[in-house]
Amino acid sequence: MDSGDIEEAGGNGEEEFRSGPRLGGSKYRPVVAHDRAVVEMSSIDPGSSSSTLKNIKVVAPGDVGAGVRGPEDGVNGHQKESKLELFGFDSLVNILGLKSMTGEQIQAPSSPRDGEDISITQGHPKPPALKMGTMMGVFVPCLQNILGIIYYIRFTWIVGMAGIGQGLVLVFLCGLCTFLTTISLSAIATNGAMKGGGPYYLIGRALGPEVGISIGLCFFLGNAVAGALYVLGAVETFLKAFPAAGIFRETITKVNGTAVSESIQSPNSHDLQVYGIVVTILLCFIVFGGVKMINRVAPAFLVPVLLSIFCIFIGIFLAKTDDPDNGITGLRLKSFKDNWGSAYQMTNDAGIPDPTGGTYWSFNELVGLFFPAVTGIMAGSNRSASLKDTQKSIPVGTLAATLTTTSLYLISVLFFGAVATRDKLLTDRLLTATIAWPFPAIVHVGIILSTLGAALQSLTGAPRLLAAIANDDILPILNYFKVADTSEPHIATLFTAFICIGCVVIGNLDLITPTVTMFYLLCYSGVNLSCFLLDLLDAPSWRPRWKYHHWSLSFVGASLCIVIMFLISWSFTVVAIALASLIYKYVGLKGKAGDWGDGFKSAYFQLALRSLRSLGANQVHPKNWYPIPLVFCRPWGQLPENVPCHPKLADFANCMKKKGRGMSIFVSILDGDYYECAEEAKEACKQLATYIEYKRCEGVAEIVVAPNMTEGFRGIIQTMGLGNLKPNIVVMRYPEIWRRENLTEIPSTFVGIINDCITANKAVVIIKGLDEWPNEYQRQYGTIDLYWIVRDGGLMLLLSQLLLTKESFESCKIQLFCIAEEDSDAEALKADVKKFLYDLRMHAEVIVVTMKSWDIRSEGNSQEDSLEAFDAAQRRISDYLGEIKRQGSNPLLANGKPMVVNEQQVEKFLYTMLKLNSTILSYSRMAAVVLVSLPPPPLNHPAYFYMEYMDLLVENVPRMLIVRGYHRDVVTLFT
């Protein structure tokens, strides 16, 4: 029996149904191919309901057209997948392990039942890349990067200059900065899966791609140049320990201006360059060997370093005290007390105390000198792509390395301050080698290997950081450095080596060194700010496994980083921030759009919610009123298929904003059933949004599917917007094509939209002559004429002022025509309107037009066009009424009410529109744009009649805005 059939098979059918699909008698069994914690539901237990399943054939959707499957395929193939099909989603078995589970917006692969084939790798699968654990992946790299040359050759000098007390403060301050940064790093790194890139990945996902790339590239540059610093330190120590190894020797006859009895052969500066290039190339070969080679070599660099530090401490305890003139006193309380205070003074270029020297050292300068000795905490996170478990290794390994080195420094301050006199601390550059047991050479080896180990870690982490930035595909210029997930970043390594060799060739890095320190501090402040923002927002997705964090700690860490930057050098701080700002701007201009769900988006969301709540449900005060137009994109007329919105509608929407401030909502309605047109609506919405962005109009796009346009607009006008951010003005095109397209549907829809706007208390702006509306480059001259007939809350006045703020209308002047009754006092009305405009801070020429009872036909030939339109409208309305009378029935309106026609009232409406149109043509035929009040549709009049009224109003006016306000003021007299 096929696995897809359930049939009654005599007396044994039920037994076969019971026993066939059960494997091993278990109801649930593990799915070995994916996750042992995921179980697969067994076949349906027939039980008492088995009788309802008889004689039913079940065919899986994926089997249609695929031929007949064998029994094995039914059990092991698609049957497993189809048991949860009724939920409408892929089962956990199908989605576990996809990259989309990490929060990245990646398209999931199609299911085989979509008709696509599954690609099966032939032969042996590719072995997984070697992954590192906490010790070799994080702790050792961090320790190698932190323990550098400063501890060996400058730390004793720092203790002598700052004293034990301020030395402890100095170490504690710098250690606190890195400790707080490690806490923030641990929190972010344990908040989900982490790909390559280390701090760049964390900062970018928290603060956005622009901030992430700008800080990430600065951090990459800092690592690359730091590699050169470490290489030069190793080579310089080697040449001082073995002068005979110099290739380009120079003869020294004077030392500090004093002639020596015998000339001294010393290595030349070119030796630094040659040896530095050779060492850099050798280190690059190790890096090219991959993670496996680095893991083998790293202990060889670290073990001698730890051994040399151990020998230094043995030498401290075994220091000879029989020669006090040598300056080494052994561990003595007297030395401890003498060295407790600071001794800031002038020194020469070599750091030797000299009253005539050119350098004065203070606490701030010592911070800049010592801080590179605590950097390197990002060495483990830089290789996050090579770690087995980032959420475990990064916090434990980084924190252990930070605490270990900080404790070492604090203990060293106490011991160095108690083992020698201050003069010895300030004059012996290699005091650590002098006191080391059993001989100084072991410290020389430690210095060389520590700097080489730090250089190796820099040349390992920097290329991976650059490759991670390139793989995010934000900056096209970095595409050359892209690598596959399991590949080594060879091109990025070559580029890093090129930068490193260039700095080695320069040789003198005194000006670059502070900038490198700034890049490290800039990265640390970015990590702290990221954790601060995520902690403060506390989004539902913020669930780090590392629980020992708080937004206040991150804030203190970020503040401390910035303070230390300015303590070291405010000028180099400005340079580092300026470089990061330039990269930020470049990414914003040239980079591709990327949405990583960063913290800024969450902050904007929460700020928007808080602002929306603070607005409340009360009406907005006129001083704070902004137009929020609801732009009706395609209500009538046909546009090209690739143009989702009339181009001039976007131009007009921009005219309603002062200096771009405001928001427009562009909506369009698709006729049809939502279930059938949902995908079409999504594509149309994307197309409309893209077009709005192309027109540089700030707004949002919405597509609504409805049975017809009237129902769709009614739903939009009721539900669009939130709180006080609902649209307050409906903007649409005047249907000039209604007479030749549809004599019934367009008028009915047009009148229905206006009535819905009045009911919803929305303002209305109808644009006649939209095709001739000027764009931002078409400058207009003349006047903007307002025909103020009814009180509209000042909306028409406000629109005219907004038009003047645009380049296309800034050369125009405003004329305000007040339409008065025949018995009104024109002069008094004019004076009142001028006073009103003055109080509103608006400039306009006021003209009062009195609508007298005059016969329009006595005005001569100037209004022949209006008269012809009037006569034509009369004839069409008479024919319409005659047709109704001949039918002998009482027709109903669109709202179901009976149509009641008063022919005298119809004549009055037509005559009023005729007089208003003739007045507009008399005064405003050459106006840039005319604004006139919108008359509401008369009750119980057919929509056809209203369209005749409106056609008569706009006759021969090339460009007109028909405006209706709502029952509230949008302008105010008061400040």
UniProtKB/Swiss-Prot annotation:
Please list the tissues where expression of this protein has been recorded: Expressed in young seedlings cotyledon tips, plant vasculature, root tips and axillary buds. Expressed in root vascular strand in the pericycle and other parenchyma cells bordering xylem vessels. Expressed in the xylem/symplast boundaries of rosette stems, rosette leaves and cauline leaves. Expressed in stipules, trichomes and hydathodes. Expressed in pollen grains.
Deletion: any effect? Answer: Bushy plants with small leaves, short roots and short inflorescences containing a higher number of stems. Alteration in pollen grain development, high number of aborted siliques and few siliques with low number of seeds.
Q: Which residues lie on this side of the membrane: Extracellular?
A: 154-167, 236-273, 318-359, 420-434, 512-515, 566-571
Q: Which sequence ranges are listed under topological domain Cytoplasmic? A: 1-132, 189-214, 295-296, 381-398, 456-490, 537-544, 593-975
Q: How does it sit in the membrane?
A: Multi-pass membrane protein
Record field: transmembrane? 133-153, 168-188, 215-235, 274-294, 297-317, 360-380, 399-419, 435-455, 491-511, 516-536, 545-565, 572-592
Q: Which InterPro entries match?
A: AA-permease/SLC12A_dom (IPR004841), SLC12_C (IPR018491), SLC12A_fam (IPR004842)
Keywords from the named record: Glycoprotein, Ion transport, Membrane, Potassium, Potassium transport, Sodium, Sodium transport, Symport, Transmembrane, Transmembrane helix, Transport
The record's Gene Ontology cellular component field reads: endosome; Golgi apparatus; membrane; trans-Golgi network
Q: Where is the protein localized?
A: Membrane
According to the record, glycans are attached at N256
Region: Disordered; residue ranges are 1-29, 104-124
Question: Which sequence ranges form a coiled-coil region, renumbered to this chain?
Answer: none
In terms of superkingdom, the source organism counts as Eukaryota
Record's keyword annotation contains Flavoprotein: no
**Listed GO MF terms:** sodium:potassium:chloride symporter activity
**Family, as annotated:** Belongs to the SLC12A transporter family.
The miscellaneous annotation reads:
Cotransport is inhibited by the loop diuretic bumetanide.
Q: List the NCBIfam families.
A: 2a30
Main role? Cation/chloride cotransporter that mediates potassium-chloride and sodium-chloride cotransports. Involved in plant development and Cl(-) homeostasis. May be involved in long distance Cl(-) transport. Does not function as an H(+)-dependent cotransporter.
- Protein name according to UniProt: Cation-chloride cotransporter 1
Q: Which organism is it from?
A: Arabidopsis thaliana (Mouse-ear cress)
Name the gene for this chain: CCC1
